[in-house]
């Protein structure tokens, strides 16, 4: 596309080693592939239907041996699909991160389903942006910044301000995967659909 990528991770993903409770469960839920990657004892869980948020989550799940059968770009869009598949009350195992939006579990519990949440990973915030990113930001050399989640956008904005780059933060083009991811930013363009393909389309069309 004619762009040079500059990486500055703002989150470090680490496993929690959480134990998986005994079922039975009707299906497994995942809003991030990390929930599956850090599942300490997947065992027979892979034989259960997997309901996932995001096409990428579903793709990685298949590569890991899971059986994704329902997926949507956002939790709110996944909820009606789950409601249409399962009679109440169904039992779900949600492999999740410690920092997450509660839309999925809240919506399922409100409908009378049982949701067991196992936090298999956590995302620790970085304490500073990468030196190369700070230098490029200060010099106005960043054409666009891509944001995949609300939390990572919040941390990026905070670290830029902490480095005295508030003005530069407001001048670059922010491209966000979703409206939620865009909310911490001074201004941002939002992908037509919440997936990487449409986010990169924003970059190509800017």
Region locations from a protein language model:
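Signature of uroporphyrinogen-III synthase
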Residues: 1-206
